[in-house]
UniProtKB/Swiss-Prot annotation:
Keywords per UniProt: ATP-binding, Cell inner membrane, Cell membrane, Lipid transport, Membrane, Nucleotide-binding, Translocase, Transmembrane, Transmembrane helix, Transport
Superkingdom of the source species: Bacteria
Name of the featured protein: ATP-dependent lipid A-core flippase
CC terms in the record's Gene Ontology section: plasma membrane
Gene3D superfamilies, A to Z: ABC transporter type 1, transmembrane domain (1.20.1560.10), P-loop containing nucleotide triphosphate hydrolases (3.40.50.300)
SUPFAM superfamilies to which the protein is assigned, alphabetical: ABC transporter transmembrane region, P-loop containing nucleoside triphosphate hydrolases
Record PROSITE patterns: ABC_TM1F (PS50929), ABC_TRANSPORTER_1 (PS00211), ABC_TRANSPORTER_2 (PS50893), MSBA (PS51239)
Membrane topology term: Multi-pass membrane protein
Gene behind the chain: msbA
Organism: Pseudomonas syringae pv. tomato (strain ATCC BAA-871 / DC3000)
Record-annotated ABC transporter domain positions: 353-589
Amino acid sequence: MTTPESSATSSVKIYFRLLSYVRPYVGIFLLSILGFVIFASTQPMLAGILKYFVDGLSNPEAVLFPNVPYLRELQLLQAVPLLIVLIAAWQGLGSFLGNYFLAKVSLGLVHDLRVELFNKLLVLPNRYFDTTNSGHLISRITFNVTMVTGAATDAIKVVIREGLTVVFLFIYLLMMNWKLTLVMLAILPLIAVMVSSASKKFRKQSKKIQVAMGDVTHVASETIQGYRVVRSFGGEAYEQNRFAEASDSNTRKQLRMTKTGAIYTPMLQLVIYSAMAVLMFLVLFLRGDATAGDLVAYITAAGLLPKPIRQLSEVSSTIQKGVAGAESIFEQLDVEEEVDTGTIELDRVSGHLEVKNLSFFYPQTERQVLNDISFSAAPGQMIALVGRSGSGKSTLANLIPRFYGHEMGNILLDGVEINDYRLRNLRKHIAQVNQNVTLFNDSIANNIAYGDLAGAPRADIEAAAADAYAKEFIDQLPQGFDTQVGENGVLLSGGQRQRLAIARALLKNAPLLILDEATSALDTESERHIQAALDHVMKGRTTLVIAHRLSTIEKADMILVMDAGKIVERGTHTELLAQNGYYARLHAMGLDEPAPAGAV
């Protein structure tokens, strides 16, 4: 159970960690602080100038600097207007320095946090994405970062500028009359208690707001990505209600936080102005030998205190929002990255793949997905995995490039355990094409030559497209290989998108090829062309094929029949048909059998 003390300690640690991101901008930050010091120093100056103004009304002949050469003749009525202009200019300089340079720090902080969060996404393990809502991930980069920078910069602006204003005003008041000023100081403990109470509520409510905002982003993202399904199945009303509920929940939580601030701020003002009322009574009652100017200056300085004190109390809301946002950001930044303890790096492997006694449980579950899997594939061999959905085929394919780590059994590539390879080097030797194709909102050429392939000669890109039978439709497009494909290739057909993914794999020219339902989105004619291309490409490469279609696997050197995470049969297409077993039954059904209940 989290105690108030541990929660407060946690908040302080989070806030100081957040402030560490300001370190690269420390020079600019110090300039902004200098600006706020200048700004704050003008507040007691304004109160002091009123003293001379009032005294000048009663004694027009009085001079401001009787002991200063060249200024001893300067009368109050002449000096006061000039000083007011100078004070205003001094205040303007401070305001510019403080606001401009703090804005530079704030924008730099937003950029740094967003880039670090995004870069972290690229090295997080697969299991993190399996269990984390994508809308919340996006919300952290967009919404949470904005709140965090408010705490790291805007809040500091208020704390420094208004805090220094309060300090300078209190110093001035103490110099004027220290006894009366102690009356004002007596209310500080009460203010501290009220601010502390409000801070706890603000942080709790801020966490709820962030979750609600993540839900809004998630629903919107899902609906936009699946708009065709939404329209095809008449899901508009359902999605409208789902989004309205998420947005309404966010609105209610925002209002609850606003309500908290709306209650605490007037209460705080009441306490401050009550103290002011007592102070004014004492000033008038105990005026002694003070001049009218002294009284006006003292009351003016005291009257300038409520505004900065109120702003200091309200900054708690900004800080707690930022701390709550920073907590979720640091949770993501602290997630352990993909394990990469390997040391071996090879320029090229032959593609000899061997799996020994491999078993696998998905993280955070007790269900065994793979059970004692063993097989080997020589370079140039094609191994086909068949079985009903949920039998473990795709899981096995995902273990080879180490999208998930295995602990039971071995996977060897050219006789080396894949965990001993450097992760980037291992994946360099593997090309993978999945049923769900990912294309980026870029040109066709850049989608084929993606990542490490960027910069490949145009001739190689076109050759890969030709081998994947994609060039024929690309040449018909207005801009050819420079045509923009839209978000995730929305401007292309399913078969066209699949052929671009295959072209990307062909351009990579990796010795190990994994085809996970790679031809499932193609029509019969396109599949025939692709199959011919794959027959050529697979020469000299180890190919692991996962398919539900007969034409894809009939030429395999070995077919592994999987069920419930085990290999139940193995052999060539002809051998397995002759056994008249599980494969023969799948073959009779077209190799596409539904998964049992609860299959993953």
